[in-house]
Amino acid sequence: MRIIRPVFSATGLLITATIIMCLTLLPIGCERRSPSMTMLTQVPQRRTVVGYKRTEFGAGWGSSTTRPGCSVRDDMLQTQLTVLAESDRCRPIAQGICPYSGRVISSDPAMAAGEPIELDHIFPLSAAWDMGAYAWPMAKRLAFANDPANLVAVAKAENQAKSDSLPSEWLPSDSSRRCWYVNQLADIAVTYELAVSAADAAVMRHQCPMG
């Protein structure tokens, strides 16, 4: 199969992606503080709740609801990235911009330029467990782990650096993308009634202007 390579530069891709994000799903660089920021449940600090395992949120990714045989991860890469070539029905060669670093990412760096991709839980599973998910029924934990609102394709290096940290311990390396990140995290926390520490809440508010 002939691989379709992008004809635009990384800079052009970044500018185009930023414009699209401002107009559609990821208003990076043009957002204001989410209303969810005022609705956060705060606790003095994050305490470790014993018993966390990845399998408490399901054995891997859930199945796609629209493409039989594919996974939720496959769906997220398909919708959040630009498909360059249909090398595989579930996992095409795709490219995009990491919403944490602003750098080009690729689902297959050997075939299309960009850093390797991982799919990140914006509100990490381990952190969610500590902040209340330990008490959820399995069905709710499965839904949380596979909720598209909590999933984002990012550079592997950013995801590894973040690990299970919340904002008082980690923020995106690109400072212009931090408001978007904490807004997303606040929305998820409010939706799922997850608490954040006072330190996390303070850092989150600091990243976004009022309005």
Q: Predicted segments — roles?
A:
Residues R2-L13, A17-L23, I28-G29, K162-G211:
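C-terminal, well-folded lobe of enzymatic/effector domains
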Residues Q45-V154, N159-S163:
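Betabetaalpha-Me/HNH-type nuclease active-site subdomain
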Residues R2, C22-C70, A198-A202, P209-M210:
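N-terminal module-boundary/linker segments of secreted carbohydrate-active enzymes
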Residues M39-V43, D75-T79, A128, Q184, ...:
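Residues that form generic nucleotide/phosphate-binding pockets
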Residues M1, M21, M37-M39, M76, ...:
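Detector for methionine-enriched segments
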Residues T41-V43, A112, L171:
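Alpha-helical interaction segments
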Residues L13, P35, Y134-M138, S168:
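A near-ubiquitous, low-amplitude feature marking generic local secondary-structure context
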